[in-house]
Amino acid sequence: MKSIAIIGASGYTGAQVTSLIQADDQLKIQGLYVSENSLDKGKTLASLYPVYSHIDLSLAPLTEQAKQAIVNEADAVVLATDHGVSLHLAAWFYQAGLAVFDLSGAYRFADSEQYPKWYGFEHIYPEVLAEAVYGLAEWNTEAIAASKMIAVPGCYPTASLTALKPLKDLMTDSLPVINAVSGVTGAGRKAQLHTSFCEVSLTPYGVLGHRHQPEIATQLGQQVIFTPHLGNFKRGILATITVQMKPGVSEADIAKAYEVYESAPLVNVYHNQFPKVDDVVHTPNCLLGWKYDPLNGYLVVASAIDNLMKGAASQAHQCIKIHFNY
């Protein structure tokens, strides 16, 4: 049984990953941690989230003594923390010998020059960054198993790449157009006016400047036009993607490409049928639906995931299972 420490456990993603690890009989929780100045330190997880009343664990401050206890007692650490925090913690725990599953964007780009532009910091751990692998579970199994530094993908990239990667050899060089809508949990637990119930309405944000655009483009190997939207619902993502296919591509070719997911139990593909957010909420699944116009050569594919599950916590759990081979 592997022991897992969870840092940032008071947030939506941290609480969700805690529940998944607690329910896994191959894993045990070494401890739940929050920052030393967190207002949640000392509280139980159940007091913050009554839905997790069966998890009788308190949120401990991440002191230097706590970090050393994690190194001594845990096999791996999950970081459900901001990229500015994960940058340092991931390197520290990795260099101490633990497997690290980082849910932030601090290690998703192999190219260190991307970080000042998209995340606002210089990456100061090149030796750790060089070992990081991108934890897109259905596609990078061998790398996830071999590395102790796993950068769990973002929510929008997970939805988009799951839809697009099988099509890479069938697409033209024309940029795929991705319009994606996420529930407000994607903005985190901290109170903000623009994500409060009375303020939320369907609206685009981060237009032509969202940091998930280069993440998608890097992993796809092709530039994309990505426009995220905030939806007036709690959780879930629906990405609707338009792709120009190469001349001569048929429906049979597309169906054949998506057969790559026949051995992937969490990804289901439908032809001429499209998913809705409610189909995936509170599940680790990704549902894809596609339709092709052979006359004009355009494919529309919709991808639905739960942003807190497949887009974060359950994909981290997948990566843990892959890494520890069970």
UniProtKB/Swiss-Prot annotation:
EC number(s) recorded for this UniProt protein: 1.2.1.38
PROSITE patterns reported in the protein's UniProt record: ARGC (PS01224)
Main location: cytoplasm
Domain of life from the UniProt record: Bacteria
Pathway: Amino-acid biosynthesis; L-arginine biosynthesis; N(2)-acetyl-L-ornithine from L-glutamate: step 3/4
SUPFAM superfamilies the record matches: Glyceraldehyde-3-phosphate dehydrogenase-like, C-terminal domain, NAD(P)-binding Rossmann-fold domains
Spans traversing the lipid bilayer: none
Pfam families referenced in this protein's UniProt entry, alphabetically: Semialdhyde_dh, Semialdhyde_dhC_1
GO biological process, any: L-arginine biosynthetic process
MF GO annotations: N-acetyl-gamma-glutamyl-phosphate reductase activity; NAD binding; NADP+ binding
Task of the protein: Catalyzes the NADPH-dependent reduction of N-acetyl-5-glutamyl phosphate to yield N-acetyl-L-glutamate 5-semialdehyde.
HAMAP family noted in UniProt: ArgC_type1
Family the entry assigns: Belongs to the NAGSA dehydrogenase family. Type 1 subfamily.
Name recorded for this polypeptide: N-acetyl-gamma-glutamyl-phosphate reductase
Organism of provenance: Shewanella loihica (strain ATCC BAA-1088 / PV-4)
Organismal lineage: Bacteria, Pseudomonadati, Pseudomonadota, Gammaproteobacteria, Alteromonadales
